[in-house]
Amino acid sequence: MEHRCGKKLFEKTEIVSHEYAGADCYCLTVRLPRMMEVPELPRAGQFYMISLHDKSHILPRPISLHSFDEKQGTLSFVYRPIGAGTQELTQYRAGESLAIQGPLGNGFMIPSAGSCHIIAGGGIGLAPLPQLIRAIRCKQPEARIIFFAGGRDRHIQELIDFFALPADIELVLCTDDGSLGINGFVPDVLSAYIEKCRNSGNLCADIAMIYACGPTAMLNKIRAFSQSAQLPCQLSLERRMACGVRACMGCSIQTAAGVKKVCADGPVFDSLLFPHELP
C-alpha cells in the first residue's frame, strides 16, 4: 500500500518545535509541505525513519508517530533518548531541516464492531497511543475507552499531562514503585480490572479490542491474558531496524504464519500470531 506521505523516499521537512515532554521524553514536530497533496493519512501505530545530520550514524532511527495535524501539515514524534542517535536528535532546533521517510508499516486496525476499547501502554510505548485514542473517537464517538498507562514512577504524570488526553476516556495509571496511581505493572492491573468488572457486570461485555504497546515483557503478559480470556488483541512490537522497508532481515520474527518482518508486516500484529512468548 502506498501511504500518504510517501513510502520509498526520504522527504525534507522543517522542524517546527522541539520540546521536553516529561518523563525523560521529548516531542519533535516537523512540517511536511506536501502532506495536504496526497491521498492517505498516516495511521496510529505506524512509524517513520528519521535521518540524522551526523552521517557517522549511517542508519536512520525508527520512531513511531505520536500525532499529526492535517490542516497544519505537521507530524509529531515523542521519543526517549537512549543511544547516541537519539541523544543527537535532542540537539536539533526549530527552523532546522530534517529528512524523514514514512509512514511505514502497518498500524492499529480499529474494528467496527464492539463498543469498548481497551488500550495499554508502558513507558515510551505510550507515545503512539494518543493518536489511537483520537482515531477511535473519530470512528466511534460514543465508544468507551479505557486507557491503562504505566511508568517507572510518578514522573509518568508529566507525559500524561503533555498528551492532553480527552476528558471522557477512563484513565488508569500505575507505577512500578507505587508513587502514582496503582502500585503494579500494566498487564497485572489490566487483567485484574477486566476480571473484576466482568464478575460484577460493570464492564461492557462488548469489548472491541485490546491494543498494547510497550516493553516485550508487558506485551507477552497481555498476549497471554487476551488469549486465555478469548479477547481480541493487537500488539505493537519494537525491534531494531536497519531499513524500515522490508529490504533487510534485521527485524524478522517467527510467527504462527511464518517469518514476518516487523517493519513491513508490523509493527502492529494480531496477538494470535504469537501462540508462544515473543522473543
What do these predicted ranges mean?
Residues 2-94:
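Ferredoxin-reductase
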